[in-house]
Regions:
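Short, surface-exposed interaction loops/tails
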Residues: 117-157
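Hydrophobic alpha-helical membrane-interaction elements
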Residues: 23-29, 34-35, 96
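N-terminal single-pass transmembrane signal-anchor helix
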Residues: 1-27
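A generic fold-level signal
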Residues: 1, 38, 116-118
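Extracellular/periplasmic head regions of type IV pilus-like filament subunits
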Residues: 51, 55-127
């Protein structure tokens, strides 16, 4: 009875190792795309909530959330206690079901950002696979979030 030679076993192990590395690379890419899809979905949901808020109150600056009626900027879900964060206030008022959290957020100052005025808003995120060019997010005159805070994607209204 003859078994496998050492060379044959090494070839089989090398092939299995090569195939497993391809599978793991594909899984990592899928996870990255899923996290970016969640970020885009979160921004759209907050944008809709802000539009509904503006429709009722005439401003995109959420009262009781720290920006004041003249506008402001900050972290969307920073856990302020008084005043509360913008996202938490939108939840409190019934415009959002839950506070959106970036999938890889490690602290309240590493997630989504918001800038608002009475007439418009911009929401910022950091995508792992951003588009080749950042969308035009200078609607509110804020142009440094991409460099100052590492944000590479935004939506504006």
């Amino acid at each position: 009875m003859r078994g496998f030679t050492l060379i044959e076993l090494l070839v089989v192990i090398a092939i299995i190792g090569l195939l497993s590395s391809v599978v793991f690379a594909s899984l990592n890419s899928a996870r990255t795309k899923a996290r970016d899809a969640k970020r885009l979905s979160d921004l759209r949901q907050v944008g809709i909530a802000l539009a509904l808020y503006q429709d009722q109150y005439g401003t995109f600056c959420v009262a009781g959330a720290g920006a004041g009626s003249s506008g402001g900027m900050g972290w969307l879900n920073y856990p302020y206690t008084n005043p509360v964060g913008v996202a938490q206030q939108l939840v409190n008022l019934g415009y959002l079901g839950a506070v959106p959290v970036d999938p890889t957020q490690t602290s309240p100052t590493s997630g989504y950002m918001v800038y608002c005025t009475a007439t418009n808003f911009t929401l910022y995120a950091t995508l792992e696979n951003p588009p080749p060019a950042m969308p035009n997010c200078t609607l509110n005159g804020i142009t440094d979030y991409d460099t100052a805070y590492g944000k590479n994607y935004c939506i504006s209204q």
